[in-house]
A protein has these predicted regions:
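C-terminal boundary motif of the adenylate-forming
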Residues: 193, 231-255
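Adenylate-forming
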Residues: 168, 201-230, 256-266, 283-290
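Residue-level signal for inorganic ion chemistry
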Residues: 60-63, 154, 192, 200, ...
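Conserved C-terminal "lid"/linker of ANL adenylate-forming enzymes
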Residues: 237-240, 244-245, 277-310
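Conserved ATP-binding loop and adjacent catalytic segment of the adenylate-forming AMP-binding
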Residues: 39-42, 108-158, 167-170, 180-185
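Conserved AMP-binding/adenylation subdomain of ANL enzymes
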Residues: 1-12, 19-84
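Gly/Ser/Thr-rich phosphate-binding loop
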Residues: 58-62, 70-140, 236
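Conserved ATP-binding/catalytic segment of the ANL
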Residues: 148-151, 155-214, 219, 231
């Protein structure tokens, strides 16, 4: 909360996330207070666009799903003057989006940079108060969730990221068994797979509990495959899992992209299969997708807007 991110005093911060989430409470409210910001509360996601025009914020904290929605508005502008588009969507004063809670496609950093908007990615969990790492505007590395905060240190054990420091919880309230599983010798077992490069930048590759173990013993992170396929505009949401011994992808297609490509309902499966085939041609055998399911509704989500896997 006290990390100097070089935000000018009295920056206007529009809070659009649920206040009961640690991410919002820490980074919107406490961070906003510590940096002397003016904190404006968004009263409804349905009125977010109107409130952006009302409050004219400089900074907003979002989850990737929100950023992707705004990215579509920017992409729809085509070759229009970036300054005019930015003024229409955000206002010329807007300069920073802080992103956390899920994977963000790296190419979105380039899209928003075209409009002079920096996306600062971070990583954390409630058990760590919640921020573990963050990106700073003058030190961005695409694909990374930033560098560790000064009060955190990390190690990787069997592919799993473990952290310790002053922000790590003492334990789960009246849950000694769960605490013992998660905290071991002062280290918090995050359950996330990842690595730290030679410059101290943290990269995440998936969740340990989501790993798919193939018949020949290979480990496959479904998030890796999902993130690769989400680069395709026709795929709005995707869930990769093991089903009857093979890797299966369930896809919710993007309706607007279907219209743009002139695809009818009865041709969408064939179009998606072509995308899967294209991915499979480049993927090693153990990471190939052998089954495709198409759904006509969004996946059920958690309160933090992540797809429910189980």
């Amino acid at each position: 909360t006290c990390l100097d991110m070089k935000f000018p005093e009295r920056s206007v911060l529009l809070s659009v996330l649920p206040v009961h989430h640690a991410y919002c409470l820490s980074m919107d409210i406490l961070k906003g207070i510590s940096s002397g910001s003016v904190i404006c509360i968004n009263d409804s996601l349905f009125r977010m666009a109107a409130n952006i025009k009302l409050f004219r914020p400089n900074i907003m904290l979002m989850v990737p799903m929100m950023i992707e929605t705004l990215a579509k508005k920017l992409a729809a502008a085509g070759d229009k003057d970036p300054k005019m588009v930015k003024e229409a969507v955000f206002g010329e004063q807007f300069h920073t989006i802080c992103s956390g809670g899920a994977y963000l496609q790296p190419e979105l950093l380039d899209l928003f940079a075209k409009y002079d908007i920096a996306i600062l990615q971070g990583y954390g969990m409630t058990e760590c108060s919640p921020v573990i790492s963050t990106t700073l505007s003058w030190n961005i590395r695409k694909g990374s969730v930033g560098q560790l905060l000064p009060n955190c240190e990390a190690r990787v054990v069997d592919g799993e990221l473990q952290v310790r420091g002053s922000s790590v919880m003492q334990g789960y309230y009246q849950m000694p068994e769960e605490t013992a599983e998660t905290l071991q010798n002062g280290w918090l077992l995050t359950g996330d797979l990842g690595y730290v490069d030679e410059d101290g930048f943290l990269f995440l590759t998936g969740r340990k509990k989501n790993l798919i173990i193939t018949k020949n013993g290979e480990n496959v992170s479904p998030e890796e495959l999902e993130n690769k396929l989400l680069e395709q505009p026709l795929i709005r949401e995707i869930l990769v899992r093991e089903a009857e011994g093979v890797i299966e992808a369930e896809v919710f297609p993007d309706e607007e992209e279907m219209k743009a490509q002139g695809l009818a309902e009865n041709s969408i499966t064939e179009a998606l299969q072509k995308l899967i085939d294209g991915y499979n041609e480049q993927a090693p055998a153990y990471k190939r997708i052998y089954r495709l399911k198409v759904r006509n509704t969004e996946f059920p989500k958690t309160p933090s807007k992540k797809i429910k896997r189980y």
